[in-house]
Amino acid sequence: MKKTLFVLLCLLISLTAARGGDKITTTNPERLPVQARKFLSEHFSDTRISIIKIEPKGSATTYDVLMENGVAVAFNHKGMWTEMDAKVGSVPQSAIPADILQYARDRFPGCEVQAAKRDGKNTEIKL
């Protein structure tokens, strides 16, 4: 009985460890949710996709897209952006909610948005 339980436990651990490396790397935008493709075509129409990393996390898959201009965009399983980070340059102004962008322009003239993060209704930007 102990031996059978031990074998089953080892099998379970090995299967769990094997599933940990299910990341997919591609450059095909068709692998993204429709909402994510729409967002990228609206706000990054002049920039091509460098790489897409798809990471299944239970029932919620996440998508990390690196654009050729150095901006990284993370999407949730529904295709809604959750993070944008510009290593060089800035995040496209059109991608930032208008009220937040106007607030930043009024208080910090001349600054550009370097990163943005949102969860639900809250959006945070880094200038």
Question: Language-model segments: which ranges?
Answer:
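Hydrophobic h-region of N-terminal signal peptides that target proteins for export
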Residues: C10-A18
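Positively charged n-region of N-terminal signal peptides that target proteins for export
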Residues: M1-T4
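Amphipathic N-proximal alpha-helical interface segments
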Residues: T61-V88, L127
